Amino acid sequence: MRICLNNAFGVDTSSIFDDEKNVICKNFKDKEKMRRAGCTAATILDRLCAFVRPGMNTHEIDEEGGSMMRDFGVKSACKGYRSGNRIFPSFTCLSVNDEVVHGIGLTDRVLQEGDVLSVDVCIRENGVIGDNCRTIPVGVVSSEVDRLLRITEESLYVGLREALHKKRVGDV
């Protein structure tokens, strides 16, 4: 199912899809709830990234993320997520180095100086989901890793500037 956010960002997206039968147009109240959930997730993400230090295990970081969610009065959209007979056990998704995405917080996964950590915070607030992710250096990283992180972030913003009304993913 696709969601059409008419004027959510000041852009009319009402005709973005050729097939309108699967489009749910959100009203202003729904869009504000989505924006608030995104902002809450972003705030938790900022604080959780600042918490990360070499020598911590990913379970500690995940537990801190769960604690922050409780402090904000929101729930994790990850923990307890069901896919078939599998249930996701963590509050956050924490992926180290070459792990792709949706890593689980583990007590035996200890962060080392120079690692790279992707932190994904996905929350439920007022019936909607806010989801933010960031990849950060753990302590001091090599110049190659620092360059990779910098260029990757710059590329994200270049892509966002090109993600315009009626453009296809291949155009971006």
Can you say where each PLM-predicted feature lies in the sequence?
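Active-site neighborhoods and metal-handling regions in enzymes and metal-associated proteins
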Residues: 1-172
